[in-house]
Amino acid sequence: MALWPLLLITLTIWILVRKWTLLRLGSSLPGPWAFPLLGNAQMVGKLRPEYIFLVFTELRDRFGATYRLRLGPQLWVFLHSAEETRQALHDPTLRKADTFMQLEPLIGNGLLISHGAHWTRQRRLLTPAFQPQLLRSFAPAIGGHVERLVGRLGATRGAFLEVTEPLFACLLDAIVDTSMGAQLDTQSVDHSPIIQAFHLSSKLLFKRMINPLLSSDWIFQRTQLWRDLDEQLQVIHSQMESVIEKRAKELLDMGEPAGRAHNLLDTLLLAKFEGQSLSRREIRDEINTFVFAGVDTTTAAMSFVLYALAKFPETQTRLRKELQDVALDETTDLDALNGLPYLEALIKEVLRLYTIVPTTGRQTTQSTEIGGRTYCAGVTLWINMYGLAHDKEYYPDPYAFKPERWLPEDGAVAPPAFSYIPFSGGPHVCIGRRYSLLLMKLLTARLVREFQMELSPEQAPLRLEAQMVLKAQQGINVSFLKQ
């Protein structure tokens, strides 16, 4: 037994020597009291999804715009100013935070978590799949899936229903159709296995990400949590691989015509880098990244759009008036849709108030300066996007829903750049941001044109929780009455 104190002392000395620069930097920053060795790991490990993002914002109010948390030997620094955010997102020496690497079982080494030369290559190869001209060609296909949703909602005859599931099915079908050319048809079945697999995978991965004890792959892969996750991943990967192989065979039979990529999957299958095609694993990683990130974030955003429309009926009236001269069918004029200021303002305000991705992180790889402070290698810099979007310095009355704050004709003053970054920013800005906005605008416009939406009188006051994305803890219940 006498050996344990000696081992503990040795471990402490080793950590102090190895992490001395980090410890010294951490001691120069304000933050909550930290235990020796453990730091604030116990506090972070106890944070529940429904308030974890609020705690990080409250700590800003207590300790200032830049504060630290310690998780054992790790140093987390939270940034809350628009200028520091701009610098961090443009710093070429930073890479994605190590925490995001825990998404690898689902999305592999896709754009969301890759960095360095691999990220640069993949970004360059994928960019053609998101050109405006190609996105425009998706409108009719998206419109078809939206019409199926309109039919489903109309069939409820004004009964209240929770909106997340029908939105998720519609968006999953639309995203897979336009990015892979495949028909999942999840809107026509109840309890689709792949939808359930996406939901469960997201919850299980988030449980791991907020538990410091599971940061080690070796430990995590020996838990029941991993076994549950692996079961869901088998469903997702088998479905995606089946679609990839089917399309690869079709292109092979066609002779792989150059310049004929019609979507993201075609772009990946036809891509060449230094004469070499992408591996099936690389293709699957990028497809899974796009589908998972796209459907989860856009579903959450659209849920809050419908909540806002139903809670504030005047927004429906104003938007419906703005839409009266816009065709919303296979001939939809996307220029006209993109030129509607109130639709744009409504979506911007939803993405600000209900910050779909509350935080993003970067890892220092060498000494770098941000906001006049020098950070050594090994620091995790967390950008609190929720805190930025709810900072009264940038947004007066920040917790109020005010689409007019984005309308110059209503006297709005533009907020500082990088105080509003729903799709992140800098070189790593979300490659699918225009696609996501296209989905949201088409869906919002069509539903407002078709229905009068009302919030259930039994809808509890909105309580948010952060999982992979921000969601309404108790769901959002809305009725859809035909105009």
Swiss-Prot record:
Gene3D superfamilies: Cytochrome P450
Cofactor(s) the protein requires to work: heme
Main location, first listed in the record: endoplasmic reticulum
Listed EC numbers: 1.14.-.-
Any one Gene Ontology cellular component term annotated for this protein: endoplasmic reticulum membrane
InterPro entries cross-referenced by the UniProt entry: Cyt_P450, Cyt_P450_CS, Cyt_P450_E_grp-I, Cyt_P450_sf, Cytochrome_P450_Monoox
SUPFAM superfamilies listed in its UniProt record: Cytochrome P450
Membrane topology: Peripheral membrane protein
Keywords on record: Endoplasmic reticulum, Heme, Iron, Membrane, Metal-binding, Microsome, Monooxygenase, Oxidoreductase
MF annotations from Gene Ontology: heme binding; iron ion binding; monooxygenase activity; oxidoreductase activity, acting on paired donors, with incorporation or reduction of molecular oxygen
Protein localization: Endoplasmic reticulum membrane; Microsome membrane
Domain of life: Eukaryota
Keyword Isomerase among UniProt keywords: no
Listed Pfam families: p450
Binding site residues for heme: 430
Protein role: May be involved in the metabolism of insect hormones and in the breakdown of synthetic insecticides.
Family as reported in the entry's similarity comment: Belongs to the cytochrome P450 family.
Protein name: Probable cytochrome P450 311a1
Underlying gene: Cyp311a1
